[in-house]
Swiss-Prot record:
Gene expressing this chain: rplK
Role, per record: Forms part of the ribosomal stalk which helps the ribosome interact with GTP-bound translation factors.
Alphabetical keyword list: Methylation, Ribonucleoprotein, Ribosomal protein, RNA-binding, rRNA-binding
Species, as recorded: Albidiferax ferrireducens (strain ATCC BAA-621 / DSM 15236 / T118) (Rhodoferax ferrireducens)
GO molecular function (one): large ribosomal subunit rRNA binding
Protein name: Large ribosomal subunit protein uL11
Length: 143
């Protein structure tokens, strides 16, 4: 028989920098999960990824206090800001533009995000990422 799932915990954790301090400690502690075990496993799995890059992680908690977790790809907004070279998007994206992004950069981001997107093909994924970039006040070239 499969283990009984008691809940899910969704967090954004910097790659390679999971530690028991908030928000990880309290979120896992209230479910009775071993916080240090998660931190060590997460840091081991994210070794090859740029340190500090925020990664969404979904932790499945089971009734016997065990857990599994799935690491997703980084948020599109963070990848777009990194490609453009800005720290934050425009407060008024319709009038004030913060930078520009090329189709090649969009394709690179789409390759990274493809497993988490619902897009049918690469072109649809590029258009999805381009829409996110436009809503952040970034000029999109070649789409």
């Amino acid at each position: 028989m499969a283990k009984k799932i008691v809940g899910f915990v969704k967090l954004q954790v910097p790659a390679g920098k999971a530690n028991p301090s908030p928000p990880i400690g309290p979120a896992l502690g209230q479910r009775g999960l071993n916080i240090m075990e998660f931190c060590k496993a997460f840091n081991a799995q994210t070794q090859g990824i740029e340190p500090g890059l925020p990664l969404p992680v979904v932790i499945t908690a089971f009734a016997d206090k065990s857990f599994t977790f799935v690491i997703k790809s980084p948020p599109s907004s963070i990848l777009i800001k990194k490609a453009v070279g800005v720290t934050k998007g425009s407060a008024t994206p319709q009038s004030v533009k913060v930078g520009k992004i090329t189709r090649a950069q969009l394709e690179e981001i789409a390759k990274t995000k493809m497993k988490d997107l619902t897009a049918a093909d690469m072109d649809a994924a590029v258009r999805t990422i381009a829409g996110s970039a436009r809503s952040m006040g970034v000029n999109v070239e070649g789409v």
